[in-house]
Amino acid sequence: MFTVSVDPKLIEHCKVMVSKHDFGKRFTANGTKEQQLTGIIGQSVVMDFFGKGYVDGSYGFDEGVDLVFADKTIDVKTMGRTTAVKSGYTNNFLKLQDYFDTDIYIFCSYHKIKQVLTVCGWISKEDFVVKRRFYPKGSIRTRFDKTTFTTFADLYEIDNKDLNNVNSITDLKNQLK
């Protein structure tokens, strides 16, 4: 895992994008504006790593492909947090996004108070299908800190320890080549 500071200009750009565009174009479980903002921030930071700029919502729905690198389609999944990420943490993935034609998932956590993004790791869709755990809508899940929440949609989980670890932007790019 590695953590980077998020440029305030990127955050402001993402706020404008979320105010102008609805990034929850699914039939259900579209996420709140705050959840959409978290996702757009994570996606924009990772896009910027690869020289792809920031998210531009005017192009419409991206079919689950946030960027392409080394001929691989990549979907960036970002969870919002108010604590630093730990290796034992879990990443959530909505089942209804499973049909997208994506080769790679990059899982991130955005610390909303410190405004830093942690790249937790990445995994191929093929490996994700093998390693993930499924929880139907309404399941009660227990977090790392022993608090609980009820799933609002069918959900997959994968732990940080099951992702390919990366130590830097360069390491991430080299592993994805």
Task: Tell what function each PLM region has.
Residues 1-70, 77-177:
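Nucleic-acid endonuclease domains
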